[in-house]
Structures are given as C-alpha cells and as structure tokens.
Amino acid sequence: MTELHEVVAQREFAYSRRDFDRVSRLLFERAGIRLADSKDAMVYSRLARRLRILKLTRFKDYLEMVAHNHQEQEHFVNALTTNLTSFFREPHHFEALSTYLKQHPNIKRIWCSASSTGEEPYSIAMTVASVFGTFTPPVTIVATDIDSRVLQKAAAGIYSANGIEQLPPHYRQQFFYKGKGAQLGKVRVADELRRMVQFETLNLMSPTWDIESPIDIIFCRNVMIYFDRDTQRKILSRMVKLMTPEGMYVAGHSENFTMYPELVRPMGKTIYRPVN
C-alpha cells in the first residue's frame, strides 16, 4: 500500500506528505479546522481543480500562492469546506424552535452560524413564518458561512425539486415556486421567504464578528466537530456572551457541550441554554 508520504505515481500532480501537512497548517490558520490524515484523498481531489484552473503543475507552487494571495486563500478555504445539508435536517430541532417561539414571542434575533447552501436558514425561516403566521415577523434571521461560494447559492434559493419531496405539501406550496421549461425539476424559495434571511460571510475564527447582539437563538450545528477542544470552547464562549439569558443554542447531533457547564446547560437533545 502506498504511504501518505510517498508521491502517488498515477496522480496528475505531484503531491507529498509535506504538501498535505502544509495544507493542514494553512487551513487551521485560516479557518481553525484540523484535517485528519484520512482526508488526504479529499484534499488532493478538491485542490487539484484549483491547480488546473490556475494552470499550475505542482502543489508546492499552489500552496505558495495560497500563503501570499488573499483571493486564493478564499478559494482554498471554500474548496476544503464540507457542505452537507438538507431542509429540516435533525427535525427535532425545528420542533423545539417552534415551541420556543410560541413561548417567547418577543424574540428579536436568530443567528444561523453555518448557513452552507441555505437549507438550514430557510428551514428556520419557514418555522418562524409558520409560528407567527406572516412573512414579516418581528424577528431578524442572519445566516453566515465562511464559504462565500455556498452563500451565493443560498441567496439564489434554487434547489432540486427532489430536495423538498419530504416536506409537507402545504410547505411546498407556500414556500416554493416550481421551475418550468429550462428550470423543470428545480424549485425556488418564495421571494417573501428569501427576504426573511440576511446572508453574510463570516469566519468563526476571526478575532471580531460583525454580528449584532443580543441574540436569542443560535444554530451552530455540525461545525464544532471540525475544531479542537480549545477552539470549541473559545468559540462557544464568544457565542454565549452574545446571547440573551433565556436564549437557545442548537448544536449538531454529534456535538456534546456538557463538558462546559460554566458556559451552557442542557435543555433538550443537543439544545442548550447559556449560563449567564
């Protein structure tokens, strides 16, 4: 079996363990994400596309460019960021959101901190619109992501029709337009729903966040798993400081923050309340 430190002969571009290690360092510096050795093939596949576009022949040259070119740093992070999502993924979170909104009708602000291609913030918006019975509720929904490319897709709000098949019929009818002609097989989020969500680029590793507070609800699902424990605690601490005392913090199914009792306390399955 070929070891990671060896150059794989059949690959289009020379790619060594040293290259992988440098990719890992650069990604951690720019986004705070640590790469496991098992991500070797994924790194090669995604970054090889950038080498082809830039007409480069060596990973070494590409990584030199990344180190000194701000625009390419953005492409680099975008290429290596995993974006897996769907409408109403982990549905118990949206049931909890609906209940919370009914119990706290005066909330003002919801932050979806890992928007990806938009399915999560639009699921939040559908829940908010349903509870308040209007597309103009007194709630601001801000959706951020480090990946500017996926935010463009999110703002456009165009998806495969297959992606909404699992939604209730009245949701499909109320919140989506069916595509016709060249757009057959696609759907677009209703304009009224799209206007409920503000999409912005934000890196959770940045020393400052351009996000208004106080925040009543934070969705930060399946993001912290990419950070080491020290980084997790720092980000969670910063988020909690932005929240209202009765706020709701929603984590991903594989994330557990019970080891931070000084920051949050459980109030449901992967749902927490800030300790203020």
PLM regions: where:
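Residue-level signal for inorganic ion chemistry
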Residues: 97, 218, 243
